[in-house]
């Protein structure tokens, strides 16, 4: 079972403060473990334009049609000071890894320098930090019913409102997660 380019959808009973109601996009999954980015936990008061300002990056030439007020996600509890950019191809940047035909992850500054310009990839999600599982750990969590899995959907990854991603990811596999046991305030 390879879950690369899949979503992990937290089960309602998962109460870990970071992973509660989270959707994790799996970037890599192999015999050594897994790595992913949480796509629905926005960092408070941090947007893409704030990251660019902190790094002293000024988009040139600026394309006013491209919004830089999108939230930056908490990608996970590891390396929270390190940026990870999920985006659509091309993968011409110096530190890019193709995850699927339609998704790439880049960690180099050169992708940030394109944000807000005509050179920016068509879809972008910026995160600080990442999530990781050791060999066999994710498989055990799946057996323990901590997560649901679904093939990744680019609309959910890049376009669905952040607050709806958990519910909509579960709908991909026909589950209304808001009515499952363990969801407070719902029958």
Swiss-Prot record:
InterPro entries for this protein: AlgH-like (IPR003774)
Gene Ontology, cellular component aspect: cytosol
UniProt-listed Pfam families: DUF179 (PF02622)
Highest taxon of the lineage: Bacteria
HAMAP family attached to this UniProt entry: UPF0301 (MF_00758)
Family: Belongs to the UPF0301 (AlgH) family.
Protein name, per record: UPF0301 protein CKO_04323
């Amino acid at each position: 079972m390879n879950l690369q380019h899949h979503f992990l959808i937290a089960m309602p009973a998962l109460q870990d403060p970071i992973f509660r109601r989270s959707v994790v996009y799996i970037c890599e999954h192999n015999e050594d473990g897994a790595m992913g980015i949480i796509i629905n936990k926005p960092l408070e008061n941090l947007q893409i334009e704030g990251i660019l300002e902190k790094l002293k990056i000024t988009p040139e030439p600026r394309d006013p049609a491209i919004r830089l007020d999108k939230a930056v996600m908490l990608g996970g509890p590891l390396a929270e000071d390190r940026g990870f950019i999920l985006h659509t191809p091309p993968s011409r940047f110096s530190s890019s890894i193709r995850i699927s035909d339609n998704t790439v992850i880049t960690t180099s500054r050169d992708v940030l320098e394109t944000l807000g310009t005509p050179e920016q990839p068509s879809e972008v999600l910026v995160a600080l930090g990442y999530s990781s599982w050791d060999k066999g750990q994710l498989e055990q969590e799946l057996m323990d019913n901590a997560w649901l899995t679904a093939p990744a959907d680019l609309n959910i990854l890049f376009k669905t409102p952040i607050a709806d991603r958990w519910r909509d990811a579960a709908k991909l596999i026909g589950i209304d997660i808001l009515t499952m046991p363990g969801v407070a305030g719902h029958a």
